[in-house]
UniProtKB/Swiss-Prot annotation:
Belongs to the glutaminase family. The keyword Cytoplasm does not apply. One of its GO terms (biological process) is glutamate biosynthetic process. This is Glutaminase. Homotetramer. It comes from Legionella pneumophila subsp. pneumophila (strain Philadelphia 1 / ATCC 33152 / DSM 7513). Keywords: Hydrolase.
Length: 310
């Protein structure tokens, strides 16, 4: 199957095709997320060895990571402690349940099913080394490493997460009751809410998926930032668990390992070829960006980037 050239015109076509879909809405259960422009639709692609291309239908502004931030403790702990230790804290199996499922943890715990679920990310946050401020410095260190720059925490979103995060509190206390939380509940949740509340511009989101696409090497300098083993494990988890109970549908349509967030960001990886980020805050009931998926499917078809196609 022949592929198109990767051009700004192609990205513009993908955005305009996605704009036709009016389904979904902003995630209003985190009040600050409801205040964004729900028509914002954007895409950026970094093909290895080529310049970054991006297109947006509206002026861009910083958007919080939300669940794309779950990549931070996963990758950081993999690098520092290794896979064997990480898998003592969390499993790597698709759950078939929504991202904040309590039932799944009750029935199949004490280990959360995978690091992409809220319970899994909370469990990993409790394993961040240090106490208090040391743990926040650990987060800052890994944000710097995985985004190639510092990011800021949006204080309004952080406060909103803390104020409304009762389901996450329930998950944390359930983990604690099963002896699978490595630290204090409140301190762990502060870390979790913080990583969800980091905010980034579209172009700032592109470094991490491009790093993973390039086997852990900085796409500009060639410096080995992450081990190839960490990249392999991370991409496998993204491919099987990155969009919760919609991951199978996503992989059938796009063939790209990806990680979504309810803010509207989805990062995707074409191993050996490209890093991608799409943005649209119109999300479905599963917490995934509807227009984002339309853009990723269109890009995959246009570029012949589905993993299952030769």
């Amino acid at each position: 199957m022949s592929s198109k050239l990767l051009t700004i015109q192609l990205l513009e076509e993908l955005v305009h095709a996605a704009e036709l879909n009016q389904e979904g809405k902003t995630a209003d259960y985190i009040p600050e997320l409801a205040n964004v422009n729900q028509e914002l639709t954007a895409i950026a692609v970094q093909a290895l060895g080529e310049k970054t291309l991006a297109y947006s239908n509206n002026p861009l502004h910083p958007v919080t990571l939300q669940s794309t931030g779950k990549m931070i403790p996963l990758i950081g702990l993999l690098e520092e402690f290794g896979a064997d230790q990480l898998f003592e804290w969390v499993k790597v199996e698709p759950s078939g349940d929504d991202f904040a499922s309590i039932t799944r943890l009750e029935q199949f715990g004490p280990k959360p099913s995978n690091p992409m679920l809220n319970a899994g990310a909370i469990a990993l946050c409790s394993r961040i080394p240090g106490i208090g401020e040391q743990q926040f410095r650990w987060l800052e260190h890994w944000v710097q490493k995985l985004f190639n720059q510092r990011l800021s925490i949006n204080p309004l979103v952080f406060a909103s997460e803390k104020r409304t995060g009762n389901r996450n509190r329930a998950l944390a206390y359930l983990l604690k009751s099963r002896n699978n939380l490595g630290a204090d509940v409140h301190e762990t949740l502060d870390l979790y809410f913080a990583l969800c509340s980091y905010e980034a511009m579209l172009d700032q989101m592109l470094y991490l998926p491009t790093l993973l696409a390039n086997r852990g090497k900085d796409p500009d300098t060639g410096e080995q930032i992450l081990s190839t083993e960490t990249c392999k494990i991370t991409l496998a988890i993204m491919a099987t668990c990155g969009l919760y109970d919609e991951t199978g549908t996503h992989m059938v349509k796009t063939g790209m390992p990806a990680k979504s967030g309810v803010s509207g960001y989805t990062i995707a990886v074409v191993p050996g070829k490209a890093g991608i980020v799409v943005l649209s805050p119109r999300v479905n009931a599963k917490g995934n960006s509807i227009r984002g998926e339309i853009m990723l499917e269109g890009l995959s078809k246009a570029m012949n980037w589905h993993f299952a196609l030769p």
